[in-house]
Amino acid sequence: GEGHINLKGFRQNLDVDLYLKNPSTIMGKLNDDERVAAFSVRVLSGGMIGSPYNSVGGLIYGVNAEQEKKVSKIKDAIVAGDYLTGEKRELLIGDEMADLLEVKTGDRIVLTAAKVNSNELTQDLFRVKGIFEFGNRELDEEIVFINLADGQALLDMKEGAHQIVLQFQNEATSRDNDFVLLENNPTQDLE
């Protein structure tokens, strides 16, 4: 994406408690703004990704599969299996992480993360739907993608979101310091 919307401070340390409580208000504004070509709502958390053979720390992204296709290259990076369909407990994993965990498509993965507001640990079981390769070791070794609803459930955050990623009609808009979409938002401090 060419731009991000999140609560002020979130990008500095990815604090799961700094999330947009009602992203639908922002999404309505984005839908009405002709400068915005597409956007995708995400939740994101650090966590443990485990298989029967190994565990690694990494980032868990909960994404809206349809929206994400318009703002990122995840679907194009799939090298085995399939992209997310929206079915419960699907997971995309990088080829490097899949090697570390000794998993392939169809195998089970346990995700462990901290719930928002309580920091209580939570776990859920997922199946590897697809394996991606971006060609960037950090991305391929440290990130998994799950469906947005599963991410919200895992983190116990209902309709919330950590980030909205933007794609603009004109890429130059991403450098426009006068992009005032988010001004006058009295309820949340956005950046």
Where are these regions (language model features)?
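Hydrophobic, regular-secondary-structure patches
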Residues: G1-L59, D82-E87
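Structural motif
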Residues: E34-A37, L101, E159
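Residues that scaffold the ATP/ADP-binding catalytic core of kinase and kinase-like folds
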Residues: K70-V71, L100-L101, L154
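Short amphipathic alpha-helical segments
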Residues: G1, R89, G160-I164
